[in-house]
Amino acid sequence: MSRLCIFLIQIYRKYISPLKRPSCRFHPTCSAYSMAAYERYGFFKGTYLTLKRILKCHPFHPGGYDPLR
C-alpha cells in the first residue's frame, strides 16, 4: 500500500502541482514529507503523519521548517 501512495504522490507532483501556484507553508513540502513518511514508516504510520501534516496546513498555522522525525 505504501508503494501505491508514493506512486499517487509522484503523479500529483508531476502533473497537478505544476498547474497550481506554490502554496505550501512548510519546508519540506507536504508532498515531499508524505513520500518520506511512507518510505520510512510504511502505510499506517505514514498515513497518520501525512494526515496530521495536511491538517496543520491552513492560514492560521505559521508553517516553517517541519522535518520528518
From Swiss-Prot:
UniProt superkingdom: Bacteria
Topology with respect to the bilayer: Peripheral membrane protein
GO cellular component labels: plasma membrane
SMART domains per the UniProt record, alphabetical: Haemolytic (SM01234)
InterPro entries documented for this protein: Membr_insert_effic_factor_YidD
Protein's job: Could be involved in insertion of integral membrane proteins into the membrane.
HAMAP family named among the record's database cross-references: UPF0161_YidD
Listed name of the protein: Putative membrane protein insertion efficiency factor
